[in-house]
From Swiss-Prot:
Topology in the lipid bilayer: Single-pass membrane protein
A Gene Ontology term for the protein's cellular component: membrane
Native organism: Mus musculus
Matches recorded under PROSITE patterns: LRR
Family the entry assigns: Belongs to the LRRC3 family.
Start and stop residues of the LRR repeats: 65-86, 89-110, 114-135
Keywords: Glycoprotein, Leucine-rich repeat, Membrane, Repeat, Signal, Transmembrane, Transmembrane helix
Domain LRRCT, first and last residues per copy: 145-197
Name of the protein this chain belongs to: Leucine-rich repeat-containing protein 3B
Positions bearing carbohydrate: 47, 94
Length: 259
């Protein structure tokens, strides 16, 4: 073996050793940055699995290079503003089977345009801010939530790229129209535009009118009672004055009798 072959062989060995060392450092770095209670692996990108970890909130120390994030089957109740803003490589986000009730307006800021799959099914979401899913390109699963079907929900679903697929399994737990409760959202939206419902101004006008009539009636009754009381007082005074007049009228007769 000549010197060139020997040098190439040693160079190749050094490169392989250096590569292995770099990979070990990366793995150690990823493991050291893994949130408490979660498992991290680097198969096809950094996968962070925090399923069934009894988490009550979304960890704030998630590695920036996270690609797949599983937070399902925990006790998370809300998604705060910009909680994922540093996860620019995030593609899959699973938040199913939690107790999520609140999603802040800017909850998905920073990942809305890169996220491919978002699972929010089996939570307690009734409504969200109309801008919460703005620019979201992900295939979203939001079924099995106690949705309140109204104009805001209609606007939210229209703003999502996968509107029809996302809305397909949404059931109205409650609705601005009572007859839509328990029905699929798409059926409710086909029956009526939830953002263009007639306002119930007639009821208020009726109440104002009834209150006006009621006030007039009460005023008339009060006036009538007071007027009757005044008439009764005058009549009573008149009656009291009658005996004295009769007595004065009888006095001349008594005098003539004595004479």
């Amino acid at each position: 073996m000549n010197l060139v072959d020997l040098w190439l062989s040693r160079s190749l060995s050094m490169c392989l050793l250096l590569q292995s060392f770099v990979l070990m450092i990366l793995c150690f770095h990823s493991a050291s940055m893994c949130p408490k209670g979660c498992l991290c692996s680097s198969s096809g990108g950094l996968n962070v699995t925090c399923s069934n970890a009894n988490l009550k909130e979304i960890p704030r120390d998630l590695p920036p290079e996270t690609v797949l994030l599983y937070l399902d089957s925990n006790q998370i109740t809300s998604i705060p503003n910009e909680i994922f803003k540093d996860l620019h490589q995030l593609r899959v986000l699973n938040l199913s089977k939690n107790g999520i009730e609140f999603i802040d307006e800017h909850a998905f800021k920073g990942v809305a345009e890169t996220l491919q799959t978002l699972d929010l099914s089996d939570n307690r979401i009734q409504s969200v801010h109309k801008n919460a899913f703005n620019n979201l390109k992900a295939r979203a699963r939001i079924a099995n939530n106690p949705w309140h079907c109204d104009c805001t929900l209609q606007q939210v679903l229209r703003s999502m790229a996968s509107n029809h697929e996302t809305a397909h399994n949404v059931i109205c737990k409650t609705s601005v129209l009572d007859e839509h409760a328990g029905r699929p959202f798409l059926n409710a939206a086909n029956d009526a535009d939830l953002c263009n419902l007639p306002k119930k101004t007639t009821d208020y006008a009726m109440l104002v009118t009834m209150f006006g009539w009621f006030t007039m009636v009460i005023s008339y009754v009060v006036y009538y009672v007071r007027q009757n009381q005044e008439d009764a007082r005058r009549h009573l005074e008149y009656l009291k004055s009658l005996p004295s007049r009769q007595k004065k009228a009888d006095e001349p007769d008594d005098i003539s009798t004595v004479v």
